[in-house]
Amino acid sequence: MVKRSLFLAVTAGLAYLVIDQYVVCPTYRFEAPRPFRGERFFNPYADFRPQDWTLANLHAHTASWLGVTNGRGGAADVYEAYDSMGYGFHAVSDYMRINRHGADAAAWVPAYEHGYNIPKSHRLVVGAGKVTWKDYPFPLTLSNRQDLLDRLSEDTGSAVVINHPAMRIGYNAADLKFLTNYDALEVLNAYEIAFRYWDTALSNGHFVSIVGNDDTHDAGNRRSVGRFATLVHAPGRTRAELIRSLREGRTIGVQVPQRADMPFSAKAAMLRRADTRLTRLWVDSGMLRADFAALVIDLEVVGQSGTVRFRADTALHLRLPIGPADTYLRIAYSTPDGIRYHFNPVCRADGPVGNRRTTAP
């Protein structure tokens, strides 16, 4: 009798979850995507000053939920690791929980990783006021994904980031043609690199900022920190500036070289000295232009559909004519210390640029 009751309860619960996800969830009518267009160009680095930027890691886990979730150590371990590398911001983003360690500090960032579904379709809410508990546990449809982003974006004081989109079956690259109401994409993650996903979003007119995170689950393991980072525009090192930079494209993705023979102290020193060498990035007279304070290495300019538009082994200046088919252009390069920097695109615009909008189901 007890087994039968338990079986019926489990069956009823599963049936509820299936109906809620595949029947009750709104079905969205997505507009046909279109590339960026317009005669003017939006440039998130128009007033670039190196001293206004600081390193951030916004995706790190600690031991929580009585050990059910994957995480070791505490928030103090996260703070110690990233403080030692000179980071201006280091959020703890436990699953479905806002960690309040250090909440009195001006640079404290309330954040959590949203999602407890099987495919690992996760989102990062930076500046979260509360946890949104709604999720869909089974393989997600495009409408499921959009509904969750819409719910999270109701908190207008936060920034919503799609985490590790290339991991498992959390997202399909084709989803990024349509999804709105998120601000940034975790392109750089220790588990997956997702340039194809980012270029899909950009090629279909969705301006979303690049983010790089370690996604460490044990900050005490120094090999799991200082791998990927985000440079954010925050002259005053305040949380409001951080969130605004994520929402307005003032971020730079950072890939840090990993060498087995490099002690953590050397990596920390390298990050504290990190310098993009960029002095200016601008558009003028139909040309993408950039100047560097010293030589940079392996310069690439990537455009529509992820096409490489230009390459140079070394460069002190960039002067690239912009063609009619260039809807966006983004640059990436390395410095002699091995750090690689990925910039958000300069893109065509015929109105406001961003990815927050009303999506009607």
What are the functions of these language-model segments?
Residues 1-49, 65, 218-361:
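C-terminal functional module detector
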Residues 175-193, 229-241:
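Structural recognition of alpha->loop->beta junctions
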Residues 201-208, 212:
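Glycoside hydrolase catalytic-domain groove-lining segments
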Residues 22, 28-165, 178-180, 188-199, ...:
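A metal-dependent hydrolase metal-coordination microenvironment
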Residues 105, 170-182, 219-229:
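Substrate-binding cleft/loops of secretory-pathway carbohydrate-active enzymes
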Residues 167-171, 192-193, 315-316:
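Short acidic loop-to-helix transition motifs that present clustered carboxylates
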